[in-house]
Swiss-Prot record:
Protein's name according to its UniProt entry: D-amino acid dehydrogenase
Entry keywords, A to Z: FAD, Flavoprotein, Oxidoreductase
Family from the record: Belongs to the DadA oxidoreductase family.
Gene3D superfamilies the record matches: D-Amino Acid Oxidase, subunit A, domain 2, FAD/NAD(P)-binding domain
Annotated GO CC locations: cytoplasm; plasma membrane
Pathway: Amino-acid degradation; D-alanine degradation; NH(3) and pyruvate from D-alanine: step 1/1
C-alpha cells in the first residue's frame, strides 16, 4: 500500500518506520529542511510512562487561577476570544474531575508503557543512537502536601503494574547523588526505575536515516497545503506545486494538524507552548544522572552525554513562538535550586515549541470518519514518550493487524461521536 505521511517530527518518522517495516511504500512530507526540527527539536528529553498524566486533573482549575498571579507559574494563558480556544478550555475543564482523570491517565500510561517496550525492541534490532539512558525518573516534591498527594498517582501506577518507590528526603541522593547539595529544601520524591531519557531530535534524525535506507522517501522544504477530498475518501494531498496520490494518508503535523483538517474532521488539538534550555555540563558529578521532575514548577531536568536539557511549563497562547526572558529565568531558577554546580547557564540555548494537546491528554491515533485518512497527533508533552508505540499501533491499524493493546479509546471518535 502507498502511504503518505504529513509531518517529519518524532511522530511522523516513527510512523514511517513502522509502516515501512510492515511492507508499505511510504512518503513523508515536511515544510522543514530535515526531520525533527520543530516540536521534536528540544523537548525535555524524558521517556516517562509512569508520569504520563493529563494536565486536566482535580484541583487544576483552582491552581490555574492562583498561577495567573505567580511569577514562576507552570501554567499560563492568554485568552484570544476564539471559539476554538474557548471550546478546548471548556472540554479540558470537563476532564478535571477524579473519574475522568483516572480514566485518562490509565490509557495514557497504557500507551506509554507499550511505547517504551517498542523503543526497547527498536534498540535491539537497529544501531540507533540518541544518547539514551535507562536509569529511571525521579519526581521531586518541595512540599509535604505534594508528597501526600502522590498517593493518587500511585494507585494508577499500581493498577498498571508500573514499579515505583516513594522516597523520603534522606533517600533522594541514593537515586540522584548530586541532590545532596541541592540549594532548596525537598520533601521527598517518587522514583520510577523503568523510565528512560534521550535526545528526541537525535533519535528522530537517526531513525529517519535508517527509514530512508529501508525505502522511505522524504520530501523536505515543501509546504503541505490541503487535502483533496472526494466523498468519504482523500484523493490526494497538495504539496507545493505538486499533488501526491496514495492509498492512505496520515496526518502527523502536531499542532498544525487542526488547521489542515478543519474542513474535513474537527479535532481538538491545541498548541500548548513549552520552553527549554540546553546547557553544557560543568561538573559531571554535580549534574543529574537521568531525569528529575520538579513538581512545583512542572519542569524536567534531563542528562544527555555532555549536556543538560531543562524543559517544561505550559502556555495557552495560540501559535506564539516568542521567547520571554521571564520564562528563561524560571528554568534557570529550577536548575540553580536543584543542580547549582551542574551546568553552565550562561552558555545555555533557549527554545520554545508547540505541543499538540488534546483536552483529555490522550493522543489521537488511528482511523477517522474518512476511510483512508488516519491521525497520529495530539500527544501533548508526551510525544517522545509515546512515539514508538503510536507508530507501531498506526502501522497495525493501517495494515489490518490486530494491535497488541487496546486502541479504540485513542481514536478521534471519542470527540466526534
Amino acid at each position: 500500500m502507498r502511504v503518505v505521511i504529513l509531518g517529519s517530527g518524532v511522530i511522523g518518522v516513527t510512523s514511517a518506520w513502522y509502516l515501512a517495516q510492515a511492507g508499505h511504500q511510504v512518503t513523508v512530507v515536511d515544510r522543514q529542511e530535515g526531520p525533527g526540527l520543530e516540536t521534536s527539536a528540544a523537548n525535555a528529553g524524558q521517556i516517562s510512562p509512569g508520569y504520563a498524566a493529563p494536565w486536566a486533573a482535580p484541583g487544576i482549575p483552582l491552581k490555574a487561577l492562583k498561577w495567573l498571579f505567580q511569577r514562576h507559574a507552570p501554567l499560563a494563558m492568554s485568552l484570544d476570544g476564539s471559539l476554538f480556544q474557548l471550546r478546548w478550555l471548556w472540554q479540558m475543564l470537563r476532564n478535571c474531575d477524579s473519574t475522568h482523570y483516572a480514566q485518562n491517565k490509565a490509557r495514557m500510561v497504557r500507551l506509554a508503557e507499550y511505547s517504551r517496550d517498542c523503543l526497547a525492541q527498536l534498540r535491539r534490532t537497529t544501531t540507533i543512537d540518541y544518547e539514551g539512558r535507562q536509569l529511571g525518573t525521579l519526581q521531586l516534591f518541595r512540599t509535604p502536601q505534594q508528597y501526600e498527594n502522590a498517593a493518587r498517582d500511585i494507585a494508577v501506577l499500581r493498577e498498571a503494574g508500573v514499579p515505583y518507590r516513594l522516597l523520603p528526603t534522606a533517600q533522594l541522593s541514593t537515586v540522584e547523588p548530586a541532590l545532596a547539595v541541592a540549594g532548596v529544601r525537598l520533601s521527598g520524591g517518587l522514583h520510577l526505575p523503568h523510565d528512560e531519557t534521550g535526545d528526541c531530535q537525535l533519535f528522530t534524525r537517526h531513525l529517519a536515516q535508517q527509514a530512508a535506507q529501508s525505502g522511505v522517501h522524504f520530501i523536505f522544504s515543501t509546504q503541505v497545503l490541503r487535502l483533496l477530498r472526494s466523498g468519504a475518501r482523500i484523493q490526494g494531498v497538495q504539496c507545493g506545486h505538486d499533488t501526491l496520490v496514495a492509498d492512505a494518508y496520515v496526518v502527523a503535523l502536531g499542532a498544525y494538524s487542526t488547521g489542515l483538517l478543519q474542513d474535513i474532521v474537527a479535532i481538538p488539538v491545541y498548541p500548548l507552548k513549552g520552553y527549554s534550555l540546553t546547557l553544557p555540563i560543568d561538573d559531571p558529578d554535580a549534574a543529574p544522572r537521568s531525569t528529575v521532575l520538579d513538581e512545583s514548577y512542572k519542569v524536567a531536568i534531563t542528562r544527555f552525554d555532555r549536556r543538560i536539557r531543562v524543559g517544561g511549563m505550559a502556555e495557552v497562547v495560540g501559535f506564539d513562538m516568542s521567547l520571554p526572558l521571564a520564562r528563561r529565568r524560571t528554568l534557570e531558577r529550577v536548575v540553580r535550586d536543584l543542580y547549582p554546580r551542574g551546568g553552565l547557564l550562561p552558555q545555555a540555548s533557549f527554545w520554545s515549541g508547540l505541543r499538540p494537546a488534546t483536552p483529555d491528554g490522550t493522543p489521537l491515533v488511528g482511523a477517522t470518519p474518512l476511510e483512508n485518512l488516519y491521525l497520529n497527533t495530539g500527544h501533548g508533552t508526551l510525544g517522545w514518550t509515546m512515539a514508538c508505540g503510536s507508530g507501531q499501533l498506526l502501522a497495525d491499524i493501517i495494515s489490518g493487524v490486530t494491535p497488541t493493546i487496546r486502541v479504540d479509546d485513542l481514536s478521534v471518535s471519542r470527540y466526534t461521536a
